[in-house]
C-alpha cells in the first residue's frame, strides 16, 4: 500500500485486506478472472457488507499476484434516503483502458460521496479522483 496504512488496512479504515474472508475472495479472483484493466490487471470487486450492497475494489497484477486495494472502505449504488443503497454500484473498465470509473456512493473514512469517480493506476499508486485515504 502506497498510502498511510497499518499493515493490510488504510489508516482508520475498518477493512483488513489480509483477513481470511478477503484473502479467499482475492484467491478466487486470481483463479477465475482474467485481466480486465490496463492489459495485465484484474480489477476485482470484493464483498464487504451485502446487506448494504457494499463492495471494495482491488487491482491484482496477473503477472505476480500483487494486490493493490483502492483507497476506499466500500462502494455501493446510489443512497436512497435513510434506507441507504438498494443496489450495487457500477464499475466501468476495459482491458486496454488507462482509467476505470465507479458510479456509486463511495464510503471513505465514515463519509459518503456520491457520483462518478475515475481512477488510474501508475503501477504503484492510484491516480485520478483523490480519496481521504490518499492524503
Predicted regions and their residues:
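Acidic, small-residue rich beta-repeat scaffolds with periodic aromatic anchors
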Residues: 1-8, 13, 88-135
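A short acidic, glycine/proline-enriched capping/turn motif at secondary-structure boundaries
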Residues: 49-50, 75-76, 106-108
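Terminal domain-start segments
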Residues: 1-33
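Structural signature of eukaryotic scaffold interfaces centered on beta-propeller domains
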Residues: 27-36, 84-97
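Short, surface-exposed coil-to-beta transition loops
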Residues: 52-57, 84-87, 112-114
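Glycine-rich loops and low-complexity Gly/Arg-rich segments
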Residues: 67-70, 84, 126
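Mid-length scaffold segments of soluble, non-membrane domains
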Residues: 33-69
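Surface-exposed loop and turn segments in beta-propeller and other repeat-based domains
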Residues: 72-83
Amino acid at each position: 500500500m502506497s498510502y498511510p496504512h497499518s499493515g493490510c488496512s488504510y489508516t482508520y479504515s475498518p477493512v483488513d485486506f489480509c483477513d481470511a474472508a478477503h484473502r479467499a475472495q482475492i484467491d478466487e479472483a486470481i483463479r477465475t478472472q482474467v485481466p480486465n484493466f490496463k492489459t495485465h490487471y484484474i480489477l476485482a470487486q470484493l464483498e464487504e457488507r451485502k446487506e448494504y450492497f457494499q463492495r471494495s475494489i482491488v487491482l491484482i497484477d496477473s503477472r505476480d499476484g500483487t494486490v493493490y486495494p483502492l483507497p476506499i472502505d466500500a462502494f455501493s449504488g446510489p443512497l436512497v434516503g435513510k434506507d441507504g443503497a438498494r443496489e450495487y454500484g457500477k464499475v466501468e473498465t476495459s482491458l486496454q483502458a488507462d482509467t476505470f470509473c465507479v458510479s456509486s456512493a463511495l464510503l471513505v473514512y465514515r463519509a459518503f460521496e456520491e457520483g462518478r469517480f475515475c481512477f488510474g493506476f501508475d503501477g504503484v499508486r492510484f491516480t485520478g479522483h483523490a480519496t481521504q485515504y490518499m492524503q
